[in-house]
Amino acid sequence: MVANQRFAQLRPPLKGRPAQSSICPITAKPISPMPIDADIIKSLHKYEIRILHALERMMKRYRWVPEDDLRAAVKLSPPELKYRLGNLIHRDLVRSDSVPYKGYALVFAGYDALALSDLAGKKTISALGCMVGVGKESEIYEALGFGIVILKLHKVGQRSFQTLKTNREYMPGEGHCPWIFASAKSAEREYEALKALNGKVSVPVPIDINRHVIVMSQVPGANLIRCVLEDPDTIYRQILDEVQKAYAAGFIHGDLSEYNIMTDGETVWLIDWPQWIPPTHQNADAVLRHDLENVITYFAKKYQTNYDLEEAVAFVTKP
């Protein structure tokens, strides 16, 4: 059965561990190590989930949540809290520090667990498959929902957070905003674009969102950079058509390149939308030109084409 061979269930009961394969059945490429363990997620005790929720709330005020404040929030006895925190730390869902005081912090794996547990509870997804892609700020997984779906986990890096907060206007400019919450903001931004563009532009269909995780439809084909096109001119024209339709709908991608255009050789899809800006933005012309220049440069290098940037800009921005 597909579910038994390719996916690990996120909620009990689980009869045996799924068969492991070194090859992903979707991409036919070696499976990357899975940072998310479905067995850990579905085995979380209700007290451990309560602790994760409390840390999530309190990390909006604290970088390290004081132990006394956490105990008061979760209403567990000191021995019970110590035992449950030990489990969470052992599973790498929570970290602790003793300087300048005893405190605890949620890490990405714990944030993953909360989001996936909630999505499973809503029956948006029922099982987790292999990792099928990884980017600078995201991880992509297969999952089972009503059929095979894609999970995009936004992972804004801790090191790059300050740079992102400066360069991306949707990031909060003041107050305490750890990178896990910046990742949720990035996901919200992309989900907003997918919802608005769905049915107008060739993009993945948004299904659900929870924290930093977007559930979307599976897109056939592969990233443009992995393809050898029989008819590059037709695909280039399709890309311009989709960019033009997005522009007319009020969206400039903001990070368009051969890495976030997908094609099956006949149809194209534009993916990865967290950095979009509206055509009314003060930098809209420069951002649009950069997007189109990336595409034109890629086609020129790989297929020796000679597309004109000014013609592309005029086509996309035509009334």
Named regions from a protein language model:
Residues 45-73:
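Short amphipathic alpha-helical interface segments
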Residues 69, 75, 181-202, 225-259, ...:
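Conserved kinase catalytic-core helix
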Residues 248, 265-319:
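C-lobe/activation-segment region of protein kinase-like
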